[in-house]
């Protein structure tokens, strides 16, 4: 029997399990279901997966496509927020774009500082 969801087409029971597993992994990778990883016991993880499978196997396209859309929007929003924070940090930390332009070599590095110290010590000895 062919069960079709909006984003995927699923052929049989194994396909449904694969689809549900994809949804679980999507959720799991964004850290939403904390209860899913509470126990390290393999059986309890399988049981919770089984429970989640029955929860998610609602025979309506709207619920699944809505769920996947929510996950994708959540991912896009968090990604854009983190990118914005990173770019703001770069502007405030490095206002002249020294790191961006590759002019970092103008700053004294550890090697140069050691070299200067050695020169200073030789001057003192002489």
Curated annotation (Swiss-Prot):
TM helices/strands, residue ranges: 55-77
Membrane topology: Single-pass membrane protein
Top-rank taxon: Eukaryota
Alphabetized UniProt keyword annotations: Membrane, Transmembrane, Transmembrane helix
Chief subcellular location: membrane
Gene Ontology, cellular component aspect: membrane
Location in the cell: Membrane
Designated name of the protein: Putative uncharacterized protein DDB_G0284397
Native species: Dictyostelium discoideum
């Amino acid at each position: 029997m062919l069960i079709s969801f909006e984003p995927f087409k699923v052929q049989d029971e194994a396909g449904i399990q694969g689809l549900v597993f994809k949804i679980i992994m999507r959720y799991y990778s964004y850290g939403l279901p904390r209860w899913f990883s509470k126990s390290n016991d393999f059986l309890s993880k399988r049981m919770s997966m089984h429970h989640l499978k029955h929860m998610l196997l609602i025979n309506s396209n709207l619920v699944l496509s809505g769920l996947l859309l929510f996950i994708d929007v959540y991912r896009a929003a968090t990604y854009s927020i983190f990118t914005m924070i990173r770019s703001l940090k770069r502007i405030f930390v490095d206002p002249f774009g020294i790191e961006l332009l590759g002019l970092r070599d103008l700053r004294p590095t550890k090697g140069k500082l050691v070299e200067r110290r050695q020169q200073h010590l030789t001057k003192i000895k002489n």
